[in-house]
């Protein structure tokens, strides 16, 4: 490829980047795009850098309108690529509704255990089930599977959190039910099964029953007459047995090829108080029984559950056959592995909070909905990403970068721009006149207004330590939207004012964000990878609860303003 052709390609990619982001791109971004589309140029990467620097220097002297005009002239298709929203959304496959009776509504449910706030994984279930309900003008139910007061003990606050966060995600439930409020219903159905001879009270030792089950042999209680089983059941309800002395089993096929299917437990005794019902009940249904009951009585027509729960339907269908019920249509989806967060369960997160490892459920290190909300992730972005995943049994590796990219589409047009200087270092500028720097609040929307920053003569400017550490005498820094400085000393850091000519960018001058020593506000940014302390422009105090972009740093959400501004890291 001729040098001239390469330069035109670089110019196209650089102009597109500048037009999209409203600022001169980093050389690496342009080079990466070039080498990604033309891998044959990779052996010549070093030779290309001077061409890239020259093109970027030229673009640095152009206004946004000039950038758009030039891009329209040499590569109008790249303008169109940015302006047309591509529909890459896979969306959700249609549901099978052939089994619905006349007038029957599509009804779906999300069934969380309220032992903590919803995580990003829970959000998938909320969003997909809600979306299907809306697609078919159906019903979306939030049902709390809270019948395990010992191992997965519910949190009272979590009931409210789930409903509130579902509403924030744009997925308000049509009905909210807690299984712990409906134990009399489960007892009634258990007694029907006992009368039918399809359930029995077992008082075998756990190890004894396990050995019998593995051998495909019935326990001595399996053929107990229904009347005697009912007496034992009533004894269970009355507290006549200790914690592990009795269970109610569903009679299935004791010789089933899968031992897990053989006479599984429907109810067990739990003496630990329940956060909602206290000590009112001590005989609690297992999830497979409770869920089977609720799906029937709530009129659930379609269930979406993890493929790791495929056996659940086989277990529950015994009950449905015994009671003459029709089982809902079931779809399964694969696991989602959340890259960048490691393995987080609600119990692990709770232990970490109690140990002081995390600030709370909204700690940015955690993949909870409330943490993402506090960081400035938009509910629309979460919805789009989850719906795009679709419903497939294939396991998915989900990178947070995917969510960040979706969120960036939403916040980038809205977020005002400001300077934030992490780990500030003083740069003494000699020979500089009094100057008023003027920078747009948004590079692509000048109607929004400008930030004006007054800078005294011979000022002390604060710049990031990372830039200060790399500055050497003779280097030229372009203080963004202010002027140019030639470094004269490193310890302390000093420089001479050398005007405002943007042509210094052709010489490789580095663009640096800055704040005056007098015109900034102490700012702390909390992110998933740690904290950043520095100084930001004073005007960010007008952005409470808004997402803004700290130029050359990241998007952040301004959380609190109390002397020091506290911001939460959103994403790059």
UniProtKB/Swiss-Prot annotation:
Domain of life, source organism: Archaea
Main location (coarse class): cytoplasm
Pfam annotation, one family: tRNA-synt_1c
GO molecular function, one term: ATP binding
Disulfide bonds: none
NCBIfam families: gltX_arch, PRK04156.1
Protein name: Glutamate--tRNA ligase
Biological source species: Methanocella arvoryzae (strain DSM 22066 / NBRC 105507 / MRE50)
């Amino acid at each position: 490829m001729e040098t001239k052709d390469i330069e035109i390609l670089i110019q196209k990619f650089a102009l597109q980047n500048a037009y999209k982001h409203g600022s001169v791109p980093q050389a690496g971004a342009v080079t990466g795009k070039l080498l990604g589309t033309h891998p044959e140029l990779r052996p010549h990467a070093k030779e290309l850098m001077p061409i890239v620097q020259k093109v970027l220097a030229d673009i640095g002297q152009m206004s946004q309108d000039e950038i758009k005009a030039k891009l329209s002239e040499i590569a109008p298709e790249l303008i169109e690529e940015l302006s047309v929203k591509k529909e890459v959304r896979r969306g959700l496959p249609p549901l099978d509704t052939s089994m619905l009776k006349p007038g029957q509504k599509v009804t779906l449910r999300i069934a969380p255990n309220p032992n903590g706030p919803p995580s990003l994984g829970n959000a998938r279930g909320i969003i997909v089930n809600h979306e299907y309900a809306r697609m078919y003008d159906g019903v979306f139910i939030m049902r709390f599977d809270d019948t395990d007061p010992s191992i997965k003990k519910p949190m009272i606050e979590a009931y409210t959190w789930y409903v509130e966060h579902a509403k924030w995600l744009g997925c308000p439930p049509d009905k909210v039910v807690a299984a712990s409020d409906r134990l009399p219903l489960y007892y009634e159905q258990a007694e029907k099964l006992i009368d039918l001879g399809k359930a029995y009270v077992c008082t075998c030792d756990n190890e004894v029953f396990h050995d019998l089950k593995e051998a495909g042999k019935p326990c001595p209680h399996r053929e107990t007459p229904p009347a005697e089983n009912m007496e034992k059941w009533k004894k269970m309800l009355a507290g006549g047995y200790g914690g592990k002395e009795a269970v109610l089993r569903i009679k299935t096929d004791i010789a089933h090829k899968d031992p897990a299917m053989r006479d599984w437990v429907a109810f067990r005794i739990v003496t630990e108080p329940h956060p909602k019902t206290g000590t009112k009940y001590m005989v609690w249904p297992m999830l497979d029984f409770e869920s089977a009951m609720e799906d029937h009585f709530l009129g659930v027509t379609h269930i979406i559950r993890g493929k790791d729960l495929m056996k659940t339907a086989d277990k529950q269908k015994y009950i449905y056959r015994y009671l003459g019920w029709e089982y809902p249509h079931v779809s399964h989806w694969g696991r989602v592995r959340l890259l960048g967060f490691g393995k987080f369960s609600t119990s692990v997160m709770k232990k970490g909070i109690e140990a002081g490892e995390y600030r709370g459920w909204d700690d940015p290190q955690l993949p909870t909905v409330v943490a993402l909300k506090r960081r400035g992730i938009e509910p629309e972005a979460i919805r789009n990403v989850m719906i795009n995943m679709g419903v497939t049994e294939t396991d998915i590796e989900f990178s947070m970068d995917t969510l960040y990219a979706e969120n960036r589409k939403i916040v980038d047009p809205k977020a005002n721009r400001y300077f934030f200087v992490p780990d500030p270092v003083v740069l003494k500028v000699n020979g500089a006149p009094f100057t008023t720097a003027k920078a747009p609040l948004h590079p692509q929307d000048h109607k929004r207004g400008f930030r004006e920053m007054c800078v005294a003569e011979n000022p002390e400017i604060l710049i990031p330590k990372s830039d200060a550490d790399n500055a050497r005498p003779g280097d030229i820094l372009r203080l963004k939207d202010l002027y140019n400085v030639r470094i004269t000393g490193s310890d302390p850091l000093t420089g001479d004012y050398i005007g405002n000519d943007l042509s210094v960018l052709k010489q490789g001058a580095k663009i640096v964000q800055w704040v005056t020593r007098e015109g900034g506000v102490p700012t702390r940014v909390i992110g998933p990878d740690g904290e950043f302390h520095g100084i930001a422009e004073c005007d960010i105090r007008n952005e409470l609860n808004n997402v803004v972009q700290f130029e050359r740093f990241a998007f952040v959400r301004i959380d609190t303003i109390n002397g020091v501004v506290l911001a939460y890291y959103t994403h790059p």
